[in-house]
Amino acid sequence: MRVTQLSSQSFIFPSPELALREPNGLLALGGDLTAPRLLAAYQRGIFPWFNPGEMILWWSPDPRAVLFPEDLHISRSMRRFIRHCPYRFTLNHAFADVISACATERDEGTWIGRDVQQAYCQLHALGHAHSLEVWLENELVGGLYGVAVGAVFCGESMFSRADNASKSALMVFCHHFTQHGGELIDCQVLNAHTASLGAVEIPRNFFLQQLSQLQFSPLPAECWLPQSLNFSSAMQ
């Protein structure tokens, strides 16, 4: 089966069912990272992932890794940490700083090149991409970012520069997300870190069914307004 070459004149993607089995989920190549194309991709359960300087690759793996926010796993050690959590949390206060940190904190290299950062910052400016920041005093020590598609949040990356910063970020985000009607977090591909936090694999078809329904359930505007978030309320 051949991988589809995307047209520069159209934002139409092939069906995810046509994705390769090996490498798992590779569906298409080419195109660009303009906001309309990125949104068209996420609405169809497709995401970009490629090495900087190389052709853009588009993926929809099977199975798909997801996190149901209510199933977030909090370990005993994390519960002990929570009692004296030194951090404060904000939403959409420093998106560009978060995505830049996600790019630089990867020892094994990153796909988040300058063009990717610019593309997602544009999505953020349009109100589709969002970040959660973790602060120790006035220093950014952790965070995550992703793209909202109705009641689904497509998580892209997270980073941590202090103990449990990224785990705390996800805990606070899950609480805020569900409080405003969010139902599903797309983790794309399962790894040891996301699995330890409660992410599971589900069949791609089931994920696409959920996405097709939940993307038409937009969360209230106040969910994504820049704001400070209360860590203690997330633990109740």
Swiss-Prot record:
What reaction is this protein's catalytic activity? N-terminal L-lysyl-[protein] + L-leucyl-tRNA(Leu) = N-terminal L-leucyl-L-lysyl-[protein] + tRNA(Leu) + H(+); N-terminal L-arginyl-[protein] + L-leucyl-tRNA(Leu) = N-terminal L-leucyl-L-arginyl-[protein] + tRNA(Leu) + H(+); L-phenylalanyl-tRNA(Phe) + an N-terminal L-alpha-aminoacyl-[protein] = an N-terminal L-phenylalanyl-L-alpha-aminoacyl-[protein] + tRNA(Phe)
* Keyword set includes Transferase: yes
**Cellular localization per UniProt:** Cytoplasm
> One Pfam annotation, family name?
Leu_Phe_trans
Instruction: Please provide, alphabetically and separated by semicolons, the GO molecular function terms listed in this UniProt record.
Output: leucyl-tRNA--protein transferase activity
The record's top EC class is transferase
Q: Which GO terms describe its biological process?
A: protein catabolic process
Q: Which HAMAP family match?
A: Leu_Phe_trans
Under Enzyme Commission nomenclature, its number is: 2.3.2.6
Keyword Electron transport found: no
Recorded hits in PANTHER family, A to Z, give:
LEUCYL/PHENYLALANYL-TRNA--PROTEIN TRANSFERASE (PTHR30098), LEUCYL_PHENYLALANYL-TRNA--PROTEIN TRANSFERASE (PTHR30098:SF2)
**What does this protein's UniProt record list under function?**
Functions in the N-end rule pathway of protein degradation where it conjugates Leu, Phe and, less efficiently, Met from aminoacyl-tRNAs to the N-termini of proteins containing an N-terminal arginine or lysine.
The protein's name is: Leucyl/phenylalanyl-tRNA--protein transferase
Organism whose genome encodes this protein: Yersinia pestis
